């Protein structure tokens, strides 16, 4: 029998957000345990400073073992802190609630603050997978792995990015589902804590331990994009929504600039491991910034915390709606899972998003990930290759603004097709030039601008488009699927790299990325509906989702 929640008074902004999740003491106690456990890994890393910070073959010291135990305890306690009680009842309640940003509401200072925090969150999040390209050369050298500089090593260095990117695919799907019923803010908080704990990958002495921690790091990183985009779709007014979300998602390019700069400055002095250890302060920063991220109003209403929800909706110009995305009163809907995305009326758009996501993944992890390695193979030093990548990404940052304007002005469908075609054209330049581009540094840098920057904006466009396209109850899942597919292409190409004797050259990786992008652009033009400046329920209505009744079997998670 469900208990009727007591009547609430409207809380202050600070009091409302301080509450955050169900068991704050458990969460923050767990966070302290995790942080202490991570810090206990640093003495072993520092002790290897006279050996170039090489830890291969070293046995974990007592401090590291104690740290691992503390991290395990802390993660369990923190998970208990964010999990709501009566989860089955909450799942039923949350599907009845619909929250929509007012289409004509002005951008307020709360929106600006939220967008700023989301930009930082996305940047920190994307720094994880983008670090892989700069970690692999040093990682391969320390462990004697098969790589362009050591073709006779074993096993393949590509195992590290393969495991990490596989983790991001899994994370996108898991976190998308989790955030749809447990709340956006709680999900972001726990993902941020995982950012801190998985940074111990930089202190792991064993090859297998590195792979395990990289997998966990990928799972944590894979969830941030679908959560943040779902939250922005619910709080940003329709007339500003698309362009702003693409602009924030374009911080992927900024993350590449920051990561390449850090690699050039720090790796020569502190080894490749420092790129993972940077996750400690950046993860803590993300936890601190979450004070300015509101909880999902629909989650608060489902928990009986209506006063808090109404206060948040008033600040962000949102409302609770009864519309085509809402089941009729008194109807208990079936559980909406990922299978729902593969049924009419979402099958066509989901197919287009999937094909485009796979193409983007092949570019990002078939070409972009191996740029530092391939530049070193054709004669660049590790430092020079990092600077070349950084400069190209830095010059390409204005492309993010251009892509956001295109999305806002012409809509998602056409801008995604144009940006995909432009990226494919730049990749064709690498197919034609090949290794000879090593002698033409200016041409090389110019060609790198588009795949390093434009493809990041395409990822943002896909996530923004998915967050607008799918109804509220499957929004984070839909965005999670889109984000996961942009990584799934990477899993495919990395699996090929692991099985091949050598990492593919720059010409091969460019060709692998260019072909599916062209196919994806055409597919998207044919099947993708337009979402430009439209209310979320209007998009659902035109898709044919009005009164959609989900089959309990097909829609089961």
Region locations from a protein language model:
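Intracellular cytosolic loops and amphipathic helices of Major Facilitator Superfamily
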Residues: 1-14, 46-50, 67-104, 292-346, ...
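Extracytoplasmic
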Residues: 39-45, 113-147, 364-372
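Extracellular/periplasmic helix-loop-helix junction of adjacent transmembrane segments
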Residues: 54-61, 135-169
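Extracytoplasmic gate region of multi-pass secondary transporters
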Residues: 130-137, 342-400
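Conserved MFS/SLC helix-loop-helix module at the cytosolic interface between two early adjacent transmembrane helices
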Residues: 170-207
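C-terminal ends and interior cores of transmembrane alpha-helices
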Residues: 193-206, 422-437
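Helix-loop junctions at membrane interfaces in 12-TM secondary transporters
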Residues: 203-213, 268-271, 432-446
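Glycine-rich segments within core transmembrane alpha-helices of 12-TM secondary carriers
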Residues: 240-270, 282-283, 483-493
